Each structure stands twice: as structure tokens, then as C-alpha cells.
Amino acid sequence: MFIDTAKIFVKSGDGGHGSVSFRREKYVPLGGPDGGDGGKGGDVTFVVDPGMTTLLDFKYKRKFVAGRGQDGQGSKCYGRDGENLTIKVPMGTIIRDVETNKVMADLSHRDDTYTICRGGKGGKGNCKFCTPTRQAPTFAEPGMPGEERWVALELKLLADVGLLGFPNVGKSTLLSVVTKAKPKIANYHFTTLKPNLGVVAVPGIEPFVMADVPGIIEGASEGVGLGLDFLRHIERTRLLIHVVDISGVEGRDAVEDFKRINEELKNYSVKLWDRPQIVVANKCDMLFDEEIFENFKAEVNKMGFDKVFKMSAATSQGVEEVIKEAARMLKDIPVTDLEIPEDERFIPEDKKFTYTINPIEEDGLKVYVVEGSFVDRLLLAVNVNDPDSLRYFHKVLNNKGIFHELREMGIEDGDMVRLNDFEFEYLL
């Protein structure tokens, strides 16, 4: 079974909690705080596995969670870091954020890796909050939660040459003749419903990978049929072999077919349309008027395509010439990397010290709403029921300039300050 898309949930490990502990040992008066820090949560990383060819593994398992950091303990014992999680994917996998549909990573090379979720930071133990004026802190920092998100995996085949054309023109037959691939071959449309790969290894030429993509129909660039799925698989190919049925047995016009397929390519991607093409007039063994091929060749030449060959995949006539020309052209064509437009790239949220303050009116009261990633992280580290922890919270707000900014905005005695679900009254 060929699976080329998957949707999975990934989550890095939560950080371990810091410990609240005091040294209690005989003959050691005033031992002081000795709570250790929690361990960091495990990361989630995608790595390329050259041995994988589909995303079938993700059909049965869709939830991936890294290990949690161990909590800190007394005697300044630090918690162990959570176990990292490695997810193997085939070469050519694109990772998209489901929420934004933006591309997070393109894993198209053998050694590519991408860390998608960083583990949560371990919380500090109470010994880290000891100061000359706070000699016995009764609070510690909880571990930060790990990152989590749904991602879509999309496999774009890595092949040197892509076979292009309408259904039932002989692409699968050509692939079976020049490689050891065994695609399904029959005399009806859409015999091929999934891409097939094969290695062309002919004496005297450099081996290359050929992909037989299911037949493209008119409107494929707009998603008609499975058009977008099929077109996606030829985006990475360096060279296209455009196969047409020159025999006219099915009543098709080879020139019109050629124009329509190229129009679909252009509508889907101009860069794909500009890719070098070898034009192959297949089923020439069923052609009884040589002038039909010559007229076809002349029309294709007018469109700017000069590599036109006559071939019969069924009898192997002309196949060797096509393969040798493809091998020769590949020597001069660089490897194609998928270019991702700027507006489709995923930009991670800035996790540095950021916040906003917005004044609002509620029931006649002035409320200053403080929001941002800094606020979320700070509140996780505060125990509002512990006086020492609240004093630490007040000190952080003061040191970060939030109280100063509130005064600049005109806050008055008795106004409310809201940080997420936590509110307090401002007193001058």
C-alpha cells in the first residue's frame, strides 16, 4: 500500500518540577533549602530514513509523545531529563503545521533532521530562590509544559525522471521495460492509481530513478480527480518524459493531448512547466502512416520542444534511444530542491520576553489586561497561595518594567490588573 499523506499529533515532554526541600541533618544547624531542579522534557525530532518509501507507519500510530523530565529531589538532586523521541520519515517528506497550513520543514536529503517540539524547561528547586533576605523559600518552580501540535506529513517522491501523460498512453509499460518495477498494466484508463518507482540501470549509462505517475486529466491543476496528488509527485523530478499516444486508436489527438497536459503543468507551477521535457510518441507500432508522426513532431517543435522520439514500449522499439537521451540530459541538470515561497513558510512564535498591556472597562472598573508568552510562563512558575511565591512574582513584574509601564499608562489606586485568569488590585 502506498500512503503519501498523514496527519499526526506530536508533543514534547513536560519539564520536571523543582523540589521544595530543606536539609535536615544531625549536627548541621540551619541546613537551609536544598531542593533540586526538575529535568528538561524530551524533544521530538524527525529524521530521514532512506529505507522508508511510504508514510504507511503513520496510518496505524498517530500520537507521538516524548518523555517527561523527572522531578527534582532533596539534597540538591536534579531530575533526569526526559527521553527524546525520534520519528523516522521517508526522504522527500514535507512537514506542515495543520493550524496554519504553513511548511515547517522539507526533509529531502539523506541526513536531514528537524526538531519540531522542544521539551519543557525543568522547574528550579527552592535552593535557587534563596537570597540574603529570603533565606528559607517555601516555593519552587513547576516544570514548563512541552510543546504540542498537529502536523501533516506529505511525501513528494524523489525521482530523477518523471513519466507524464494522459491515462493509458503506455507510461507503466515503459517503466516495466526499462526497470525491474512491476506496475499494474492493463488496457483501461487509470490502471495506475499510485506512483511507481524504478531504477533504470542500463550498461554504459549512470543509473537514475524513474517515477510513473498516475495519468493526469484536464483540470488536474484545480484538483479534478486526484490531480493535485499526482502533480505533487513530479515536483522534485529533474526531467520529464512526456508520453503521448500517437496511434489515435482511442480517437485522441496527440497534439491536443500534449498541449492540455502542458497547460495543466503551467497552471499548477510555472517552474514545473519550465522543466526540461523529452517528448515520446508511443504506440508507433500501431501507426501505419509515418506522416502522422512527422506532423506531430513539427507541431511540438513549434512549441519549443526539440527532443521528440518515436517509440513502442510494447515492442521496445526506440526505447533505448529515449533512455540514453534522458541519461545524457541528466548529467547537465542539477538536483531539484523544492522552493517554498516565503508566505508558505512557518515562522515559530517568538518565545522571548514579550507582552502587551491593554486597558479595558468592566462594570465601571478600569482593568489592565497583560498578555503574552512571558505572562503564560511566569504564571506557571507562581503559587498564588504561597506568600513567598507572591513576593517573588511581584518582584519579577517590577524588575521587568511592567509596573513602570502601568504607571506610565495612568493606572490609579484600586484599578485591577489581569494576567490570564489571575487578577489583583493595584495599590500605590
Swiss-Prot record:
CC cofactor: Mg(2+)
Subunit structure: Monomer.
Residue stretches making up the OBG-type G domain: 159-331
SUPFAM superfamilies: Obg GTP-binding protein C-terminal domain, Obg GTP-binding protein N-terminal domain, P-loop containing nucleoside triphosphate hydrolases
Amino-acid positions noted as binding GTP in the UniProt annotation, renumbered to this chain: 165-172, 190-194, 212-215, 282-285, 312-314
Name recorded for this polypeptide: GTPase Obg
GO cellular component, one term: cytoplasm
Subcellular location: Cytoplasm
Function: An essential GTPase which binds GTP, GDP and possibly (p)ppGpp with moderate affinity, with high nucleotide exchange rates and a fairly low GTP hydrolysis rate. Plays a role in control of the cell cycle, stress response, ribosome biogenesis and in those bacteria that undergo differentiation, in morphogenesis control.
PROSITE patterns per record: G_OBG (PS51710), GTP1_OBG (PS00905), OBG (PS51883), OCT (PS51881)
Positions contributing to Mg(2+) binding: 172, 192
Pfam family, one: GTP1_OBG
Alphabetized InterPro entries for the sequence: G_OBG, GTP-bd, GTP-bd_Obg/CgtA, GTP-bd_prot_GTP1/OBG_C_sf, GTP1-OBG_CS, GTP1_OBG_dom, GTP1_OBG_dom_sf, OBG_GTPase
Location of the OCT domain: 345-428
PANTHER family (UniProt xref): DEVELOPMENTALLY REGULATED GTP-BINDING PROTEIN-RELATED (PTHR11702), MITOCHONDRIAL RIBOSOME-ASSOCIATED GTPASE 2 (PTHR11702:SF31)
A biological process from GO: ribosome biogenesis
Keywords tagged on the record: Cytoplasm, GTP-binding, Hydrolase, Magnesium, Metal-binding, Nucleotide-binding
Keyword Nucleotidyltransferase set for record: no
EC number from the UniProt entry: 3.6.5.-
Family (UniProt): Belongs to the TRAFAC class OBG-HflX-like GTPase superfamily. OBG GTPase family.
Class of this enzyme: hydrolase
Obg domain location: 1-158
Keyword NADP: no
Molecular functions per Gene Ontology: GTP binding; GTPase activity; magnesium ion binding
